[in-house]
């Protein structure tokens, strides 16, 4: 009888041991540094990260900060996250290459680092929209609307990887149509409405005939439309990337904005937190880069679009 009791105790211990080993690490402190919290894209991204992190641990502390596209400020924010003992840092890198020393320092401190929206050298993983595809579908729309012939502008922006990829995707499409003439592709409209307005004003003064403009994001597209209105220039097809709330309004109203390749910042953040949680628990992603597909939002289908502010 005594031997049987020892045997039962041994079996019970054996079954209990895997449970202890299987216990997962959970986030206690998550730091997020983003390009600009003045952009609703990053507001939605921050909300997605916080929601997913708190699903893992309702008591997790999540702090989202605006770097305002200032590299030194972003370095300081990352140092602050390190000092605070963060488990995970999500970084929207102001400069993909220059940010590497800060991320290396964070990783040496045992912190998981995941890039969001743009590449970040030194990150454990990155999650972003397939920006090449986004540029392709936005510019393919232009080609089709123009019947493969016309004068077009690629309105560039801050030289982060997302913008570079969008422009490259657009250029690839335009090159397939010999009768599409690119008047300009190197003017930086700063990713803002004001920048789009200023750059487009210059282009409208410089070029007597512009058939279409691809703007690298929605704020620039809205500024572009405003410039065309101010100078009474009509019949210009404007497309962009984001699928932001303002572009939903523009697509439903009397503007020259015709399409936007959508992003889902909320889901980018959710996926980034999930990957970060896996890495924290010893599971590496199959690929260091996770790309989420883009869908083209037009005047025809905008009524069915579930945008950034839709309930989750």
Residue locations for each model-derived region?
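Gram-negative bacterial Sec-dependent N-terminal signal peptides
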Residues: 1-21
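A residue-level marker of the well-folded mature domains of exported/periplasmic proteins
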Residues: 2, 21-312
């Amino acid at each position: 009888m005594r031997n049987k009791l020892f045997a039962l105790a041994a079996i019970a211990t054996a079954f209990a041991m895997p449970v202890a080993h299987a216990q997962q690490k959970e986030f206690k402190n998550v730091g997020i540094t983003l390009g600009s919290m003045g952009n609703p894209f990053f507001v939605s991204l921050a909300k997605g990260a916080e929601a997913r992190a708190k699903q893992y641990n309702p008591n997790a502390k999540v702090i989202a900060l605006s770097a305002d596209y200032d590299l030194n400020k972003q370095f300081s924010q990352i140092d602050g996250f390190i000092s605070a003992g963060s488990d995970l840092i999500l970084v929207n890198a102001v400069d993909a290459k220059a940010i590497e020393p800060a991320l290396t320092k964070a990783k040496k401190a045992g912190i998981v680092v995941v890039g969001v929206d743009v590449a970040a050298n030194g990150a454990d993983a990155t999650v972003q929209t397939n920006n090449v595809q986004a540029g392709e579908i936005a510019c393919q729309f232009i080609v089709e609307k123009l019947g493969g012939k016309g004068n077009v502008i690629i309105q560039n922006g801050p030289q982060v990887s997302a913008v570079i990829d969008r422009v490259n995707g657009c250029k690839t499409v335009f090159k397939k149509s010999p009768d599409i003439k690119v008047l300009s592709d190197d003017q930086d409209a700063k990713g803002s409405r004001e920048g789009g307005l200023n750059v487009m004003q210059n282009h409208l003064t410089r070029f007597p005939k512009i058939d279409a403009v691809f703007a690298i994001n929605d704020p620039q597209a809205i500024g572009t439309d405003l410039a065309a209105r101010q100078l009474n220039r009509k019949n210009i097809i404007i497309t962009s990337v984001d699928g932001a709330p303002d572009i939903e309004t523009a697509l439903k109203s009397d503007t020259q904005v015709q399409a936007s390749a959508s992003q889902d910042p909320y889901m980018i953040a959710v996926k980034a937190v999930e990957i970060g949680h896996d890495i924290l628990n010893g599971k590496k992603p199959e690929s260091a880069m996770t790309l989420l597909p883009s869908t083209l939002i037009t005047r025809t289908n905008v009524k069915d679009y579930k945008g950034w502010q839709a309930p989750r």
